[in-house]
């Protein structure tokens, strides 16, 4: 099961696969910052740590939107380390105005949006406990790449597995956000 989540050969990109590739490309040295939801579950499960104080998360508090401002803080608290932020589309919409702070301060946050077009964790609970009675879980998302570029932040949308390694390499090697 774990190998299918980390090394799929077909189908759409999986959250575990993306997290695993980012942690490998960062040399297992980065600070992980997560939001709330499925992205948090996958990031905490598959991100590998080699140093203490390498994870910033709100735990089970349910604070959607936590990741972006927390990642900004992590860049100030540990300026010598790479900060990788994993966030879902729902959480990013809660605090994406902080992209302005990232632009202003040139915070070198490496932002990875795991966009599944749902409030994924909420939908999962509706499947498990509410007989698949879905309520307000699909997301009508804006063009996140365009928004980031509007703030002067380099951005790239990746949906093809063949592009993933190069996109991560560019993300981690680009100075600034």
Language-model segment annotations:
Residues 42-177:
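Thiamine diphosphate
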Residues 1-74:
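Active-site diphosphate/adenylate-binding microenvironment
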């Amino acid at each position: 099961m774990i190998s299918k989540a980390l090394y799929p050969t077909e189908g759409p990109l999986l959250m575990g696969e993306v997290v695993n590739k980012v942690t490998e490309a960062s040399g297992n040295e980065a600070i992980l910052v997560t939001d709330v939801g499925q992205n948090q579950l996958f990031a905490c499960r598959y991100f590998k740590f080699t140093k203490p104080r390498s994870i910033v998360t709100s735990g089970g508090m349910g604070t959607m939107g936590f990741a972006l401002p927390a990642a900004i803080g992590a860049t100030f608290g540990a300026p010598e380390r790479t900060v990788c932020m994993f966030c879902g589309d729902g959480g990013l919409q809660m605090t994406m105005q902080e992209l302005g702070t990232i632009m202003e301060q040139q915070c070198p946050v490496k932002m990875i949006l795991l966009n599944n077009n749902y409030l994924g964790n909420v939908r999962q609970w509706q499947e498990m406990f509410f007989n698949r009675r879905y309520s307000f879980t699909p997301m009508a998302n804006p063009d996140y790449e365009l928004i980031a570029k509007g703030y002067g932040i380099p951005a790239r949308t990746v949906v093809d597995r063949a592009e993933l390694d190069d996109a991560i390499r560019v993300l981690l090697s680009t100075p600034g956000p």
